[in-house]
Amino acid sequence: MQRLGSVWKWMGCGLIVGCLLPNAALAAADSLLIEALDVEGGAATLYITPEHQSLLIDTGWTANFGATNPDSAQRIIAAARRHGLSKLDYVLITHYHHDHVGGLPELLSQFPVGTILDHGPSREVPPPDVPPAVVPFQPAALYPKYLEAIHGHPHRTLKPGDTLAIGSLHLTAVTSDGVTIDQPLPGAGEAIAECASMRPMDKDGGEENARSLAVVLTFGRARIAAFGDLTWNMEQRLFCPKDKVGRVDLFIVSHHGSNLSNSPAMLRALAPRVAVMDNGATKGADVETYETVSKAPRLKRLWQLHLAERADAQHNVPETYIANPGLSGDEHVSIEVAVTKQGGITVTNDRTGFSETY
């Protein structure tokens, strides 16, 4: 089956009209192509500009853990080659949890990579009761391996407010290392009513989550929010009492859809038209998040990488909008997105070739 990156023509399906294409969604040569890879509850999202420059956000799990047969790095490399890439220009690591940074050493050893972007040093210390078998997969153990792996590569630590142009794709860091931008981005600054009832949360899933390098990506008039595993309390600082980010067109649902993130205040502020959730079959996609995202103003459609097995049918999207609906043993199918500079969004389920345009 041909993918977005291998066919550079456009076939319109109409505004919010679904269609079944024989080979997957066909995209114009001036579109931004996005592939949300299935790395079994980890994170790995590939962005390819019309200039054929590339950005990978996160790298999934280490080999033989999480995503296996093939592992996360192999899935990323296969996607890059499928889209005609011989190099990944930028790899951005949002934070140093195993499901986000684990695949990087294997990736760097097997495929050319340019510049590495991150939030700076890991500061998470393993809890005293962590089982010995888990210690090698904690940030304290993974971060030294990360530094060893990126040695010799161009490396940039992004701070809040830093920007980067990747061809016609423009990146702005809105949080990094537990710090938010000081001033609202252009078009932001609205008071968010949901802030009045928002209370701090005493759980964060690990300190590195709160230190996620969260970015807003701008492509023409289109805006995309990709916040890694940014936590509820950091969202409160970023969106309350006034929104510092502004509305977006596409939202990569934070933290795999965990209820430790994805506050009503953030969804009110971002008001995405389309959301893609990179959940696993039994990881993320919490009921509270499903309800919050589904109620976001302007939302036309939520897509899921997996059926959320812990939720009922009312808290999963219809199977048409799920890339991997099977109970275990899926085919690691991606969700692909084509974004135009005018803000048009076409999302394709690679399992079926079904596309919908918004």
List each model region and its residues.
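Non-globular, low-confidence helical/coil segments that flank catalytic cores
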Residues: 2-6, 10, 25-358
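Bacterial N-terminal signal peptides
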Residues: 10-23
